[in-house]
């Protein structure tokens, strides 16, 4: 099984408009050679969104770090349990404490092992892969929003999405319902760069601009810092979170 050597970085920023930062991000590796990235974007206002995203990412990262050896064919089940556990923790805290009522969070994650990558998603944070060989940027997730649903069902055109006032309305997030709803997809992996981000990045940078940054020879931490800088330069309309994994070139 291929075990890739790589570098990673993650960074979050409050942006230029919001008064609190409700985004969270992290990356970790374990002794089995697995790589795990996670980005969460909280919702609910005041301190609710911040608390929900912190609960989610702490739960997801702790589950990854404490994961016993798990055969590759069972990793999908493992990720599902991670999502269910995080969802229950947030939902139960919101039900118990009126201060946190209606809080929730998006949660996108990527688990890389050998020649496979598993991508989990609840909400509208995104995962991308970028191939240095083909110079291709590929989105690995679908936004779970009302307008994306309208687009997928043929009720609106793709060109209409960015101009709609309801384009940020989520149809799914962790902590909103007692039962978790999430997507988990499995893709082949051959050393592509993996970027996870909140909507504060992709609403302020086009996919062409994201691809241009990933194609540079800059270090991973420099790319993350540049993503933040450019998103703020383009308005910084929301919190921004990015997590990046890049495989080192072979000698």
Role assignments for model-derived ranges:
Residues 1-251:
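PP2C/PPM-type serine/threonine phosphatase catalytic domain
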């Amino acid at each position: 099984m291929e075990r890739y050597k790589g570098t990673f970085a993650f960074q979050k920023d409050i942006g230029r408009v919001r008064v609190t930062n409700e985004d969270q991000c992290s990356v970790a590796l374990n002794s089995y050679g697995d790589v795990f990235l996670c980005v969460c974007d909280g919702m609910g206002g005041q301190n609710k969104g911040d608390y929900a995203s912190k609960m989610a990412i702490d739960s997801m990262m702790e589950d990854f770090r404490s994961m016993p050896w798990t055969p590759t064919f069972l990793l999908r089940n493992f990720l599902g349990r991670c999502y269910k556990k995080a969802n229950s923790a947030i939902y139960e805290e919101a039900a118990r404490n009126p201060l946190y009522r209606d809080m929730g969070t998006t949660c996108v994650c990527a688990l890389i092992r050998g020649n496979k990558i598993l991508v989990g998603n609840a909400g509208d944070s995104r995962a991308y892969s970028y191939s240095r060989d083909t110079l291709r940027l590929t989105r690995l997730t679908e936004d779970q929003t009302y307008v994306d649903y309208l687009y997928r069902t043929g009720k609106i055109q793709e060109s209409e999405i960015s101009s709609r006032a309801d384009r940020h309305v989520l149809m799914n997030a962790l902590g909103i319902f007692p039962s978790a709803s999430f997507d988990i997809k499995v893709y082949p992996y051959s050393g592509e760069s993996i970027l996870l981000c909140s909507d504060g990045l992709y609403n302020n940078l086009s996919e062409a601009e994201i691809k241009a940054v990933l194609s540079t020879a800059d270090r991973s931490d420099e790319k993350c810092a540049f993503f933040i800088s450019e998103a703020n330069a383009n308005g910084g309309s929301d919190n921004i979170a990015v997590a990046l994994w890049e495989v080192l070139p072979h000698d």
